[in-house]
Amino acid sequence: MFYAHFVLSKRGPLAKIWLAAHWDKKLTKAHVFECNLESSVESIISPKVKMALRTSGHLLLGVVRIYHRKAKYLLADCNEAFIKIKMAFRPGVVDLPEENREAAYNAITLPEEFHDFDQPLPDLDDIDVAQQFSLNQSRVEEITMREEVGNISILQENDFGDFGMDDREIMREGSAFEDDDMLASTGASNLLLEPEQSTSNLNEKINHLEYEDQYKDDNFGEGNDGGILDDKLISNNDGGIFDDPPALSEAGVMLPEQPAHDDMDEDDNVSMGGPDSPDSVDPVEPMPTMTDQTTLVPNEEEAFALEPIDITVKETKAKRKRKLIVDSVKELDSKTIRAQLSDYSDIVTTLDLAPPTKKLMMWKETGGVEKLFSLPAQPLWNNRLLKLFTRCLTPLVPEDLRKRRKGGEADNLDEFLKEFENPEVPREDQQQQHQQRDVIDEPILEEPSRLQESMETSRTNLDESAMPPPPPQGVKRKAGQIDPEPMIPPQQAEQMEIPPVELPPEEPPNICQLIPELELLPEKEKEKEKEKEDDEEEEDEDASGGDQDQEERRWNKRTQQMLHGLQRALAKTGAESISLLELCRNTNRKQAAAKFYSFLVLKKQQAIELTQEEPYSDIIATPGPRFHII
């Protein structure tokens, strides 16, 4: 594209054109009218910078679209103007005359209504006040509690008067003070009055008897059936029914302020025909003045009182006083602020970056102990192959070895592991092998020339299978323990003279025996590993790339030694192929794995060709195209 970005940018000269070509809906009417098509077309035909043919074509398309929009808007405006002109000058429309061009005042003005504020109020009789108040008035039955009263004489009397006169008529018969039962009945008629008021009630009854004896035969009323008028209204000779009642003695009404000794004086002035009651003779204790005992009913025996209502005070939860908490420390000193600024442990975390390469990421995922001991070196996607691999990871210990291990018959752990690693060795010959090993280990110090070469194969079967410490260290350890002039018993001297022919050479000659380089390859590797460990201890600051280079160099040396050994073996024996099973005979697992890996590296470099007839069978190596070149 031969154009600069500023030409088609948002504020460029051709921005509207480019937008119209690609996003026509984004343009507004104002953008269309602001766009100058003449200058735009000139800038497209003769641009200041070079533009591609495709870009100029897009810009011309935008010009066409903007021109189309302008023509469309112009046509719409013309149509609207034409319609308005046509509606304004349509035929049949007559102009208004001069006098009708202005609207009437009443037609455009709202009428104003002024109310008469001097109007008299309506009459109160016209307003139904009772009906209005009855709406908010409840019935008595709804707002009043029902009173449950016991056996009262009000319901039993049908005569004139609201109160019964049973006790008073009994006193008129003159038998009121003959028995003490009258006092008990009088006290029983009152429900809530205390028994100490019996004396005052008796005095009141006596005063009523004296007052009513004057009107015993005035023939007013029905005799004993006297009512309230008999007691109150007709109580004076001079007054009529509607006159004010005469002033009664103070003994008629019990007042709380009146002391008790006044009643005692009135009791002494009264003389009755019958015997005096014991209450009137004995001195009466002064009764405490209580405002609650005041009553305005003339006859207290006929009055009743409601039972007290049990008022239970609701326990309100006491409001807890809100305690204002004020921070004692109002300012932070400079030491605290400096400590907070210097402490950045809460915002710093350990750096955990992902490995830079996929290979390192895979090593990190599968480099743990749990992965190394449960997964193969290569990823197996098939579950059946993975099961076949994991089945060999947990070998079963033979039953006799397990019993011997539990019974403590094995001398040490190394001996137990040797027996476990070499189950093909007959159990009957183990004692003889121990004796032979003792015979072999001791004369190595004195005659290492012939005896060591003859017994190397047997020591490989027993010692290297369990991965014991290297022979030079064992020799040094035994040399330190043995005296410079060892005393050899005669039995051991006889065993030393046994020729090596008596050892069981039942196995066929091995390739490692023909070529000592293949046999000494693991020992050389051990020595190199020791040297490498010493170098690693001295150089702890090497990078991971250097470690990988050292590992690759080590594998290259091991592969070179394996290749030279195979070349010499094929040259000496004249064979066309070498068996891996034959090569790994009498070696431990680590040595066999190293040889197998060397085979794979040589196969990758096309030095040898590997064939295998079936899974888990022997691998045959034949010379490859680069067998003699590398």
Swiss-Prot record:
GO cellular component, as recorded: chromatin; chromosome, centromeric region; condensed nuclear chromosome; cytosol; meiotic cohesin complex; midbody; mitotic cohesin complex; nuclear matrix
Q: Which family does it belong to?
A: Belongs to the rad21 family.
Q: Where in this protein does the record put region Interaction with NIPBL?
A: 154-171
Where is the signal peptide, in residue numbers?
A: none
Q: Where is this region: Interaction with WAPL and PDS5B?
A: 287-403
What is one Gene Ontology biological process annotated in the Swiss-Prot or TrEMBL record? Answer: cell division
Q: Where is this region: Disordered?
A: 258-285, 423-488, 516-557
Q: Where is the composition biased (Acidic residues)?
A: 532-550
Quaternary assembly: Component of the cohesin complex, which consists of an SMC1A/B and SMC3 heterodimer core and 2 non-Smc subunits RAD21 and STAG1/SA1, STAG2/SA2 or STAG3/SA3. Interacts (via C-terminus) with SMC1A and (via N-terminus) with SMC3; these interactions are direct. The cohesin complex interacts with NUMA1. The cohesin complex also interacts with CDCA5, PDS5A and PDS5B; this interaction might regulate the ability of the cohesin complex to mediate sister chromatid cohesion. The interaction with PDS5B is direct and is stimulated by STAG1/SA1.
The record, for InterPro entries, names: NXP1_M-like, Rad21/Rec8-like, Rad21/Rec8_C_eu, Rad21_Rec8_N, ScpA-like_C, WH_DNA-bd_sf
Which sequence positions carry the modification called Phosphoserine?
S46, S153, S175, S249, S454, S544
- Please name the gene that encodes this protein: RAD21
This protein is called: Double-strand-break repair protein rad21 homolog
Q: Which residues carry this modification: Phosphothreonine?
A: T394, T622
Q: Where is the composition biased (Polar residues)?
A: 451-460
Biased region (Low complexity) positions are 271-285
The known PTMs are summarized as: Cleaved by separase/ESPL1 at the onset of anaphase; this cleavage is required for sister chromatid separation and cytokinesis. Cleaved by caspase-3/CASP3 or caspase-7/CASP7 at the beginning of apoptosis.
Q: Where is this site: Cleavage?
A: R172, E173, D279, S280, R450, L451
The UniProt keywords, alphabetically, are: Apoptosis, Cell cycle, Cell division, Centromere, Chromosome, Chromosome partition, Cytoplasm, Cytoskeleton, Developmental protein, DNA damage, DNA repair, Isopeptide bond, Mitosis, Nucleus, Phosphoprotein, Ubl conjugation
What GO MF terms are annotated? chromatin binding; cis-regulatory region sequence-specific DNA binding
User: Per the record, what about its domains?
Assistant: The C-terminal part associates with the ATPase head of SMC1A, while the N-terminal part binds to the ATPase head of SMC3.
Recorded source organism is Bos taurus
Annotated crosslink Glycyl lysine isopeptide (Lys-Gly) (interchain with G-Cter in SUMO2) location:
K48, K216, K418
Annotated spans, Interaction with STAG1? 362-403
